[in-house]
């Protein structure tokens, strides 16, 4: 699987993900890009789960963002509704984190659209490790990028499905 973490702190929103792609117990690739900018570059998205399924969902989210420009929450809710009710989409096995300048969200196949309480959110096989590390570091003087990078490093030290090849995307956040 993988680990994706997002941090909203100090006027920045940062999303970081590792690069490992596993097939069963085998590492197939170590430098995949699971965090990227979508839409007009004003939204960052990261995914965990089946890669083909995640790309399908990213494409759907981009279409929703075209339909609802500048409204990430609305686009995410509409995607989650489709994901939950569509017979084809319902079978997709992936999770997504998305963020823009004003909101960070987790979108799940159960139709959940979740906003973090404390400025940190993480998904994937190492998500719980990364989230715990990030929460512990949020009250320090570390920048959002430093918190994300360290949280992902800790997750990679613990989770065998997460590596240290980190991709980071950053946006300016609203105060």
UniProtKB/Swiss-Prot annotation:
Domain of life, per lineage: Bacteria
Keyword Cytoplasm in record: yes
Residues where Na(+) binds: 156, 159, 162
InterPro entries: ATP-dep_Prtase_HsIV_su, Ntn_hydrolases_N, Proteasome_sua/b, Proteasome_suB-type
Record Pfam families: Proteasome
EC number(s) per entry: 3.4.25.2
Recorded family membership: Belongs to the peptidase T1B family. HslV subfamily.
Subunit: A double ring-shaped homohexamer of HslV is capped on each side by a ring-shaped HslU homohexamer. The assembly of the HslU/HslV complex is dependent on binding of ATP.
Protein name: ATP-dependent protease subunit HslV
